[in-house]
Amino acid sequence: MSSALLAATALELAVLAGHLIAYPFGLTPERPERRPPPRSPAPPTGTGADGPDGGEAAVHAATARGEAHPATALPVATAVAPPVVLLHGFIDNRSVFVVLRRALTRRGHRHLESLNYSPLTRDIRTAAELLGRHVEEICARTGHSRVDVVGHSLGGLIARYYVQRLGGDRRVRTLVTLGTPHGGTAVAPGAGIHPIVRQMRGGSSVIEELRGPAPGCRTRFVSFWSELDQVMVPVRTACVDHPDLDAVNVRVTGIGHVALPVHPTVAAAIREALEAPEATEDNPEDTAEHTANAAGSSPGATSAA
C-alpha cells in the first residue's frame, strides 16, 4: 500500500469516526426557513479553503470532452446566488454537509437546504421524484426560478436522474457531484439485499437510462472524483462522460470517498464552481480545462488533469 493511500485511509477513518458522532443530529429533517431572495454575496476574498486542512489535497479540473487547454482559475460570480440543495449518499443524512454548509455560508450563500431521503428508498427514480417535489417547493417558497444541487455518492446519481430524465434541467442551474458512480461501480456492498445499491452497479437499468440522449440539457455538471476513492471502481466512473452534457470533471488527490464532502479543500472548489457565472451569448462558457487552486493550509500543487 502506497504512503498516499495509507494517509488517505487514515483520514477516511478519522472522518468516519467524526461523522458517526454527528450522524444522530442529522436524522431529523431540517425546518425550511422563509427568507426573501438573498442579496448579492460579498466580493470574493480568495480561493483558500475555510478551516484547518485535514490532509494535503489538490483538485484538478477537466471538461468531459476535448483535449487539455491552458489552465485558468475558475471564475467567481457576483450575481445573487440561488438556493443550494444538499443531497447525501446511501444510508447517510444531512449531517455529512456540516463543513460544506459552513464554507458556503461564509461566502455569502444564505439559502442552503438539505433533503433527507429514507434509507428504505428502493429506487433511484422514486428518490429523484422526491427531489423534484422538494425543488419545486423551494422555488415556490423563495421566489427563485432555479437552484444549485450538491450530491454526494448516491445523492449525485439521484440528482442527475432528476435533471436528465425528469426535466429537472429547467430548475437546476449547476449540479455538483462528489464521488458519484455516473458510469456504475463494481463495488456495491449490500447489492444482494438492497435494490438501490444494485442500481449503482455498471449496466443497471438506471445507468443505461443515463447513457441515453439528453439533447438541450440546460444544467451544468461539475463532478469531483478522487484517484484514491476505493468505492468507485474504476475511479473514473465518478466522471460525467456524456456527449450531450456540459460537464467539468475535477480530479482530487490525497483523499478518499468519505472525505469528499467534508474536506475544506474540496469545499473551497465547490464554492468556486457554484459561483461561476452562467454562460450567455455575450459570455459563452469556456470549455477549456480549469485548475481550481484550493490547496488549503498545507502545501499542494495543482495542474490540469
Located regions from the model:
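Flexible, membrane-associating and regulatory peripheral segments of lipid-active enzymes
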Residues: 1-85, 98, 102, 107, ...
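Short, proline-enriched alpha-helix->beta-strand connector loops that line the catalytic pocket
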Residues: 80-82, 215-221, 244-248
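Serine-dependent carboxylesterase/thioesterase catalytic core
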Residues: 84-95, 101-218, 224-225, 231, ...
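Short alpha-helix in the alpha/beta-hydrolase fold that links the catalytic acid
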Residues: 100, 233-240
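Catalytic histidine neighborhood in serine/cysteine hydrolases
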Residues: 111, 243-258, 270
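Catalytic histidine-centered segment of alpha/beta-hydrolase-like enzymes
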Residues: 124, 256-264
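Acidic catalytic loop of the alpha/beta-hydrolase fold
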Residues: 227-233, 257-258
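Post-His helix in hydrolase/transferase enzymes
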Residues: 261-273
